[in-house]
Amino acid sequence: MLSLDFLDDVRRMNKRQLYYQVLNFGMIVSSALMIWKGLMVITGSESPIVVVLSGSMEPAFHRGDLLFLTNRVEDPIRVGEIVVFRIEGREIPIVHRVLKIHEKQNGHIKFLTKGDNNAVDDRGLYKQGQHWLEKKDVVGRARGFVPYIGIVTILMNDYPKFKYAVLFLLGLFVLVHRE
């Protein structure tokens, strides 16, 4: 049987202790947001950490791998580099390798991508009439990764009840934990 001792702990708290715990929770959330914003500034990427959601980049990256990105304007995009990009009309960014670069005489660069595990290039994924990606489409470039750590994110997206259970337990831990 599940022990509900934590409810007794919450009931025993006076208003000041409960207020302190809620304030603690707010500080944790604020700190996490500040760290995220700081990473955005340092890396130059709107999303400095992403999770690989499909097997299209195997064997380089597997579903659930956590990627660390940078997006420095001064760094040129190179063939073979792994980029994370957004396509207009799609919410989720895509992680694929640069296959070809098309450079115009004015210095404007366009490029074509492909997943390592895919048979064809990504032109079928781009919006209709678009044959190349531009630098403005890039969210970041992979600079490092941690294998399978992001599987928790995938589980939370695939199973919303799991997500709410984890968030509830984390919130409860912060409220009940004294220190």
Swiss-Prot record:
GO terms for biological process: response to virus; signal peptide processing. GO terms for cellular component: endoplasmic reticulum membrane; signal peptidase complex. CDD domains: S26_SPase_I. It is a single-pass type II membrane protein. Residues 37-179 are lumenal. It catalyses: Cleavage of hydrophobic, N-terminal signal or leader sequences from secreted and periplasmic proteins. Its main location: endoplasmic reticulum. It is found in: Endoplasmic reticulum membrane. Its EC number is 3.4.21.89. Signal peptide: none annotated. It is an enzyme of class 3 (hydrolase). The chain crosses the membrane at residues 17-36. The C-terminal short (CTS) helix is essential for catalytic activity. It may be accommodated as a transmembrane helix in the thinned membrane environment of the complex, similarly to the signal peptide in the complex substrates. Catalytic component of the signal peptidase complex (SPC) which catalyzes the cleavage of N-terminal signal sequences from nascent proteins as they are translocated into the lumen of the endoplasmic reticulum. Specifically cleaves N-terminal signal peptides that contain a hydrophobic alpha-helix (h-region) shorter than 18-20 amino acids. Belongs to the peptidase S26B family. This is Signal peptidase complex catalytic subunit SEC11A. The lineage of its organism: Eukaryota, Metazoa, Chordata, Craniata, Vertebrata.
